[in-house]
Amino acid sequence: GLQEFQFEYPFVIQGIAGCELHSGKAIQSFLRAGFEGLDFVSIENHSCVPEPEGGSEAQWFCVFITQYQGILAIIDRLLSKTCPRYLLGVLDAGKAELHRQVKPEAWLSSGPTPGPGRLLLVCHVSGFYPKPVRVMWMRGEQEQPGTQQGNIILNADWTWYLRVTLDVAAGEAAGLSCRVKHSSLGDQDIILYWGHPMYIGLIFVAIIVPSLILLICLALWFWRRWSYQTVL
């Protein structure tokens, strides 16, 4: 076959095929082949078209390949149906990914002690998507200098995690807060105040739990007394 076209070994063949989506959702498919760095042939509308740079070899090749209509039919099906369907699927998936919004979760902790009389405040933000996020340690409405931001790390579910720290004197930690800004939150920023969860927990343990126990004991005492009087 190759001897008929007077191709000399070695030789280089290049090819490109695909489909493009134009304005108005018109899809144009293409297949072009090159030989020794020059345009050789292209497949258009179920037919082989020789390129001028291909010369007589390109013309003879198109005559040769036209004898095999089954091959041209397969190429045409791939270009006109399979490729556009795949392209539209990729575009739909991309649009869904671009519009994906996942709200972050945030919590506070303390890190290793930086030194005597100092605290390392840590603000964790996880599970957010897309990646851009802003996390700040604040006092009132003022962002605190010295805030250190770690690398944004990819979670197993393709959301993101970020750790932001602040080194402060132990006596200056009260009144600090961590503010999280993310597109999924709109104008409803997450604000966590340092120390508040601990105080709430202490109040719950010291007041609410004993009160509940006392109420249960009183209820049992009244119930037993009422039962005893009923028997008498």
From Swiss-Prot:
Keywords, in A-Z order: Adaptive immunity, Cell membrane, Disulfide bond, Endosome, Glycoprotein, Immunity, Immunoglobulin domain, Lysosome, Membrane, Transmembrane, Transmembrane helix
Intervals, Cytoplasmic compartment: 223-232
Ig-like domain mapped to chain residues: 84-194
Major place of residence: membrane
SMART domains: IGc1
Membrane topology: Single-pass type I membrane protein
GO process annotations (BP): adaptive immune response; antigen processing and presentation, endogenous lipid antigen via MHC class Ib; antigen processing and presentation, exogenous lipid antigen via MHC class Ib; positive regulation of T cell mediated cytotoxicity
Membrane-spanning segments: 202-222
Compartments, record wording: Cell membrane; Endosome membrane; Lysosome membrane
Gene3D superfamilies: Immunoglobulins, MHC class I-like antigen recognition-like
Cross-referenced SUPFAM superfamilies: Immunoglobulin, MHC antigen-recognition domain
Gene Ontology CC terms: endosome membrane; external side of plasma membrane; extracellular space; lysosomal membrane
Keyword Membrane: yes
Residues the record marks as carrying a glycan: N45
Gene Ontology molecular functions: endogenous lipid antigen binding; exogenous lipid antigen binding; lipopeptide binding
Disulfide bridge map: C19-C83, C48-C62, C123-C178
InterPro entries reported in the protein's UniProt record: Ig-like_dom, Ig-like_dom_sf, Ig-like_fold, Ig_C1-set, MHC_class-I_related, MHC_I-like_Ag-recog, MHC_I-like_Ag-recog_sf, MHC_I/II-like_Ag-recog
Described function: Antigen-presenting protein that binds self and non-self lipid and glycolipid antigens and presents them to T-cell receptors on natural killer T-cells.
Subunit structure: Heterodimer with B2M (beta-2-microglobulin). Interacts with saposin C.
Additional information: During protein synthesis and maturation, CD1 family members bind endogenous lipids that are replaced by lipid or glycolipid antigens when the proteins are internalized and pass through endosomes or lysosomes, before trafficking back to the cell surface. Interaction with saposin C is required for the loading of bacterial lipid antigens onto CD1B in the lysosome.
The protein, known as: T-cell surface glycoprotein CD1b-3
